[in-house]
């Protein structure tokens, strides 16, 4: 039996989808455990590019079970749209399983998300406005509606009426906007539920049975550890546990059943949205990295902020997620830069900081301490063995291993599947 968790070690967009797709080749079950359609990942399969937001990357393999776990928040409309998107392209979804305990996102969540973000003004956190945060808020407040409720017409109607009374009171009195009517939601969203009802089950049973049968199970994280609700750059975070600990609660398996935690990062750093970013580059080098790396959000299309590799960030992710293996993506993007920099620590008001501080006001004033390494000019997009990388590229990668304390599992020199080089079998380790 071997289970592997894939997490982002930075602020998301590290290329987890590609790595998950790569590791899916050997896995028998692929599961997501947190987040919603705010997380986009791009996968290249059979020379075709696909963009998914909810459904796990393993969906392209008909012999693998794909699970949407109970820790996710699911927009029924988005899910139906994504299923149709796959069906139109000839991709079967018969291998999909959806947790009956997952909470759903409804139109009032998206409205609440927008109104709250607008009300914050300059203090906004840069939400994707998908309704993720309000849905998790309702879950914690015990007024959320789950997929099991959505499929029961009477229960759905009863719960929807109750929640709308609360929400509309807030919308009308607090934000002075028109209320949302019951009929604007009920029939449409009940119909969505019926369209994916055949996939719904107790996914905790599916996952635990698979692990007990010694199947290879891959858990696919969304966003990144620095966006984790507890361990990220709070309050500029998502509303769920993106760290590996989210697997136990979000998939319904015990922590003793997790064997490997794979951390994915880029050879530099990127971020979408607001919040502190110590190594951010606002110069020509930053512009070059953004354009060469095509750093624009899968979900929002927003240009990503980019910066040098920050080992303080990745060490923090390693510690709070128990990361055992490292996947380093987008090394090729750095080709042609004369000098590369890696942040090894921070300076804050004369103090030396080796660990990531929790106070975002402190982070905003942190000055990165850099180590410089020589770059390379050789085209590395065709490299398929580590030893074939230019000497300076090898030195750069090995230094990242040393500074983060994580052994390299894969490295990527381009977006295509064959441009990801795996150094060992994670399932046999």
Swiss-Prot record:
Pathway: Purine metabolism; AMP biosynthesis via de novo pathway; AMP from IMP: step 1/2
Binding locations of substrate: 298-304
Reactions performed catalytically: IMP + L-aspartate + GTP = N(6)-(1,2-dicarboxyethyl)-AMP + GDP + phosphate + 2 H(+)
Active site residues according to the UniProt entry: 13 (proton acceptor), 41 (proton donor)
Keyword list, A-Z: Cytoplasm, GTP-binding, Ligase, Magnesium, Metal-binding, Nucleotide-binding, Purine biosynthesis
Coiled coil start-end: none
Domain of life of the organism encoding this protein: Bacteria
Gene Ontology annotations of biological process type: 'de novo' AMP biosynthetic process; IMP metabolic process
Cofactor list: Mg(2+)
Primary localization class, coarse: cytoplasm
EC number assigned by the record: 6.3.4.4
Positions contributing to Mg(2+) binding: 13, 40
Subunit-level organization: Homodimer.
Cofactor remark: Binds 1 Mg(2+) ion per subunit.
Pfam families: Adenylsucc_synt
Subcellular location: Cytoplasm
Name of the protein in question: Adenylosuccinate synthetase
GO molecular function (one): GTP binding
Family to which the UniProt record says this protein belongs: Belongs to the adenylosuccinate synthetase family.
Residues that coordinate or bind GTP: 12-18, 40-42, 304, 330-332, 412-414
Biological role stated in the UniProt entry: Plays an important role in the de novo pathway of purine nucleotide biosynthesis. Catalyzes the first committed step in the biosynthesis of AMP from IMP.
Classification via HAMAP family: Adenylosucc_synth
């Amino acid at each position: 039996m071997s289970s592997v968790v894939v997490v982002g070690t930075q602020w998301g967009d590290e290329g987890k989808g590609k790595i998950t797709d790569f590791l899916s080749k050997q896995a028998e079950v692929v599961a997501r455990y947190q987040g919603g359609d705010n997380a986009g990942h791009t996968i290249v399969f059979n020379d075709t590019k696909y963009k998914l937001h909810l459904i796990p990357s393993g969906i392209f393999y008909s012999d693998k079970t794909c699970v949407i776990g109970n820790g996710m928040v699911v927009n029924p409309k988005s899910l139906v749209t994504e299923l149709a998107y796959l069906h139109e392209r000839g991709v079967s979804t018969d291998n999909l399983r959806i947790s009956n305990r997952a909470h759903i996102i409804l139109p009032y969540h998206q409205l609440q998300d927008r109104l709250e973000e607008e009300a914050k003004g300059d203090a906004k956190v840069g939400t994707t406005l998908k309704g993720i945060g309000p849905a998790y808020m309702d879950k914690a407040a015990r007024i959320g509606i789950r997929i099991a409720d959505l499929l029961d017409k009477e229960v759905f109607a009863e719960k929807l009426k109750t929640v709308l009374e609360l929400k509309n009171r807030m919308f009308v009195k607090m934000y002075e906007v028109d209320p949302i009517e019951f009929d604007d939601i009920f029939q449409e969203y009940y119909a969505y539920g019926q369209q994916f009802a055949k996939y719904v089950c107790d996914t905790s049973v599916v996952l635990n049975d698979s692990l007990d049968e010694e199947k290879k199970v891959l858990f696919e994280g969304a966003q990144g550890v620095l966006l984790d609700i507890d361990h990220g750059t709070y309050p500029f975070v998502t509303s769920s546990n993106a760290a590996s600990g989210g697997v136990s609660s979000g998939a319904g398996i015990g922590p003793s059943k997790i064997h490997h935690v794979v951390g994915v990062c880029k050879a530099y750093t990127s971020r979408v949205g607001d919040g502190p970013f110590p190594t951010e580059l606002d110069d020509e080098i930053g512009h070059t990295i953004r354009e060469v790396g095509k750093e624009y959000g899968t979900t929002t299309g927003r240009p990503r902020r980019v910066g040098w590799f920050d080992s303080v960030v990745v060490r923090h992710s390693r510690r709070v997620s128990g990361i055992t293996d490292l996947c380093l993506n987008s090394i090729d993007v750095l080709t042609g830069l004369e000098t590369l920099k890696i942040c090894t620590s921070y300076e804050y008001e004369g103090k030396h900081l080796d660990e990531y501080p929790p106070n975002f006001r402190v982070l905003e004033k942190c000055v990165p301490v850099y180590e410089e390494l020589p770059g390379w000019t050789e085209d590395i997009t065709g490299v398929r063995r580590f030893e074939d990388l230019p000497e300076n590229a090898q030195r750069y990668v090995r230094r990242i291993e040393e500074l983060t304390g994580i052994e390299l599992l894969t490295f990527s020199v381009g977006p295509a599947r064959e441009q990801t080089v795996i150094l060992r079998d994670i399932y046999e380790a």
